[in-house]
Design a protein with these regions (language model features):
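Short secondary-structure boundary/capping segments
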Residues: 2-3, 12-14, 75, 97
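STAS-typified acidic loop motif
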Residues: 4, 9-38
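Amphipathic alpha-helical interaction surfaces in cytosolic regulatory modules
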Residues: 27-105
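A charged, well-structured terminal subsegment
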Residues: 112-117
Length: 117
């Protein structure tokens, strides 16, 4: 039996001190990337010390999802708020490597390591 994949991402935000952790579940593509981007920018508006985006439950992301993360990164740099990505699944990690964005983003194996920085 094929496992159902969450088609629309669900983002849950929790706070670890001054650090915001955004845990995302589901695929991120053109049909939902605008909503995803809005959620990320709303977290930035709360002025966290850092933002960690937990992508461990995201099996697929297309270029629109990456564009949302790039927009967050651009705005966060202006606000001096570090953005870290954590838990990228193999398929998503490959996308970041192919586009060389693994050299642009801080990427960690899991949230614990990202928060330790």
């Amino acid at each position: 039996m094929k496992k159902d994949v969450q088609k629309r991402p669900i983002a849950a935000v929790r706070w670890e001190g001054q650090a915001a952790v955004v845990s995302v579940t589901g695929e991120i593509d053109l049909s939902c990337s605008g909503e995803f981007q809005d959620e990320l920018l709303d977290v930035l508006d709360d002025k966290p010390g850092s933002i960690t985006v937990d992508l461990s439950n995201v099996p697929h992301m297309d270029s629109s999802g990456i564009a949302s993360l790039i927009k967050l990164l651009g705005r966060s740099r202006k606000a001096s708020v570090p953005v870290r990505l954590a838990g990228l699944q193999k398929r998503v990690q490959s996308l970041f490597e192919i586009t060389r964005l693994d050299k642009v983003f801080e990427i960690y194996p899991d949230v614990t390591e990202a928060l330790a920085k």
